[in-house]
Structure formats: structure tokens, C-alpha cells
């Protein structure tokens, strides 16, 4: 798939992918017992209703935006994120919620690269951005397990024999 080529009803492969992501999320949120979209989200696992994803511009760069600008919500600081959840889709325009990147302690990170060594997981937020999906050339879905990921036991990494 390359930019600018026709890929279905929306004539944009990113639009088609986001439409499928939204359908999967909605199927889980409605607790649909039988559905066609079960490869990423499992309706029997409570709380897993988000397929996080990255989007890339037409030059291959990661799209990023900011959440909690001014630091007005809760005790969260302003953060930059490259991680999104689709909330609404109309034609090729989408409302994306900004997922908050956190470290293993649950502290807010500003993440501009998915392989940042401090990045551990994602938290859903109420911060949203409206985007024209036609401005993007690629999308990468990530594991739903990243959202509300629980901290591993610290004892697992270092074992000392007495």
C-alpha cells in the first residue's frame, strides 16, 4: 500500500484501518458475544476496549500532539504523545483521544519515539484531537495490553542467592 492510491470506500488505507479499529472497539464496548472483529480485542477480558495506534505522515514521520496543555486537569502535567485511540469517525475525519504515555511507576512521560527506554504503558485520557486521516500515509496498531498495563514485580529482574 502506498500513499495516494485507492484502497476501498474511503480511498485511503489509513481511513479503512481506523474504521476497522473503531468497529472492534465498539464491539467490545457493547460486549457483543459474537462479532467479526476479535483478532485484537477479546470481549471476555474486562477493561480492554482500546486498540492503541501510531500514525505516520506522508514523509514517514510520527504524528504527535499534546495533552493537558497548561496542566489544568488533575495533577497531570502537560505531555506529548504519539499514541492514539479512535473515538469517532465521519468519512475520513476522526476524533482521536490522546493516550498518555507512562513509565513503570505510572508517571507521565512525553514520548516521541515508541522505543523510548522509559516507556512502559498507556492510559486513556479525555484529551482529543480532530484529524483528517487523508493527511496520513501509514498506521501501526499496537498491543491493547499496553493500555492500563500493570507494573511487573521488581524482584523478577534481579535474583540474589544467599
From Swiss-Prot:
Q: Which UniProt keywords apply?
A: Disulfide bond, Sporulation
Give the matching Pfam families. Spore-coat_CotZ
Chief localization: other
Superkingdom of origin: Bacteria
* InterPro entries referenced in this protein's UniProt entry, alphabetically: Spore_coat_protein_Z/Y
Q: Where in the cell is it found?
A: Spore coat
One Gene Ontology biological process: sporulation resulting in formation of a cellular spore
Q: Which family does it belong to?
A: To B.subtilis CotZ.
Describe, as the record does, how this protein assembles with itself and its partners: Disulfide cross-linked either to itself or to CotZ.
Protein name (Swiss-Prot/TrEMBL): Spore coat protein Y
> What is the species of this protein?
Bacillus subtilis (strain 168)
From the UniProt record, report the name of the gene that encodes this protein: cotY
Amino acid at each position: 500500500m502506498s500513499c495516494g492510491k485507492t484502497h476501498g470506500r474511503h480511498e485511503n488505507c489509513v481511513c479503512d484501518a481506523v474504521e476497522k479499529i473503531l468497529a472492534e472497539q465498539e464491539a467490545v464496548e457493547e460486549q457483543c458475544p459474537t462479532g467479526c472483529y476479535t483478532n485484537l480485542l477479546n470481549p471476555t477480558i474486562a477493561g480492554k476496549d482500546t486498540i492503541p495506534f501510531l500514525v505516520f505522515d506522508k514523509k514517514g514521520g510520527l504524528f504527535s500532539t499534546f495533552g493537558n496543555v497548561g496542566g489544568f486537569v488533575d495533577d497531570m502535567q502537560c505531555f506529548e504523545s504519539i499514541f492514539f485511540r479512535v473515538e469517532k469517525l465521519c468519512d475520513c475525519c476522526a476524533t482521536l483521544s490522546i493516550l498518555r504515555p507512562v513509565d513503570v511507576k505510572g508517571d507521565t512521560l512525553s514520548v516521541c519515539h515508541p522505543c523510548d527506554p522509559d516507556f512502559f504503558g498507556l492510559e486513556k485520557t479525555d484529551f482529543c484531537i480532530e484529524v483528517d486521516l487523508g493527511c496520513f500515509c501509514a498506521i501501526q496498531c499496537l498491543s491493547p495490553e499496553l493500555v492500563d498495563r500493570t507494573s511487573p514485580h521488581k524482584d523478577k529482574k534481579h535474583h540474589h542467592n544467599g
